[in-house]
């Protein structure tokens, strides 16, 4: 089989169409064209063509991978998953990853270090959340343990406290005890240890005093009473007390407030 003509593709000047015996047969990247010294008049066997096609697949995949990496640093697993989605053959994926490693495009340790530092500085994620994300990105336990040393306990507490302050602002209608529990629960879900979560909850609510809690209770009592006005007095009282207890106020505190403020649930005559 002989190459009878070679033409540059219209939409991609770095790719060439190869015609064998006057018929289009395959296309190749410019680098593959030069490597295999493809030119008009050259004779190729079926094995030659198959080898060239495989080399071109690797070249195309390499170009795609480099473009994929141009947006941000990636882990080896992220690149492997990307290439598989591009329907690259397994042999091509392995060869592309080897070439990228040789070109210093892949380094999981450097990736993990950069990713961890970025997450610590730009987000308020807890260490366990970052660890889970690194696992999902294919990092080994050894690498994860190494890079997580960057997340020192004092920085964890600082970030957890900032997160706690945000949680507190969204839940400013609850008693201090309930608010602290809400903060602890949310922080644990965000990847912080229970110990750090407790310290952050205490720190975030440290400025809440008795007067603040009394003010919150007053507003909640007024709101809950209005909501339960349609019920009979005994039911309205029970629903009000239950609702307030669910917000973290103790039964004794509620009863004392109702008594001291002479709040009655009896129907007015």
From Swiss-Prot:
Keywords: Cytoplasm. InterPro entries: RecX_HTH_1st, RecX_HTH_2nd, RecX_HTH_3rd, Regulatory_RecX, WH-like_DNA-bd_sf. It is found in: Cytoplasm. One of its GO terms (biological process) is regulation of DNA repair. Pfam families: RecX_HTH1, RecX_HTH2, RecX_HTH3. GO terms for cellular component: cytoplasm. Gene3D superfamilies: Winged helix-like DNA-binding domain superfamily/Winged helix DNA-binding domain. It comes from the Bacteria. The keyword Cytoplasm applies. HAMAP family: RecX. Belongs to the RecX family. Modulates RecA activity. This is Regulatory protein RecX. The gene is recX.
């Amino acid at each position: 089989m002989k190459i009878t003509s070679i033409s540059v593709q219209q939409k991609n000047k770095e790719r060439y169409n190869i015609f064998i015996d006057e018929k289009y047969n395959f296309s190749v990247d410019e680098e593959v064209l030069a490597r295999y010294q493809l030119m008009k008049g050259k004779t190729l066997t079926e094995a030659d063509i198959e080898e060239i096609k495989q080399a071109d697949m690797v070249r195309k995949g390499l170009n795609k991978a480099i473009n994929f990496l141009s947006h941000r640093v990636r882990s080896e697993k992220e690149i492997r998953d990307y290439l598989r989605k591009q329907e690259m053959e397994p042999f091509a994926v392995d060869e592309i990853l080897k070439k990228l490693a040789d070109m210093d495009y892949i380094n999981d340790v450097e990736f993990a270090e950069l990713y961890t530092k970025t997450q610590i500085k730009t987000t308020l994620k807890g260490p366990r959340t970052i660890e889970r994300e690194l696992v999902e990105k294919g990092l080994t336990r050894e690498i994860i343990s190494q890079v997580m040393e960057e997340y020192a306990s004092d920085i964890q507490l600082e970030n957890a406290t900032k997160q706690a302050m945000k949680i507190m602002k969204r839940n400013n209608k609850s008693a201090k005890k309930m608010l602290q529990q809400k903060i602890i629960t949310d922080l644990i879900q965000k990847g912080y240890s229970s110990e750090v979560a407790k310290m952050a909850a205490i720190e975030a609510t440290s400025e809440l005093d008795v007067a603040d809690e009394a003010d919150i209770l007053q507003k909640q009592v007024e709101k809950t009473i209005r909501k339960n006005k349609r019920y009979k007095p005994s039911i309205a009282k029970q629903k009000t007390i239950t609702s307030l207890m669910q917000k973290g106020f103790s039964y004794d505190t509620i009863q004392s407030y109702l008594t001291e403020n002479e709040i009655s649930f009896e129907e007015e005559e």
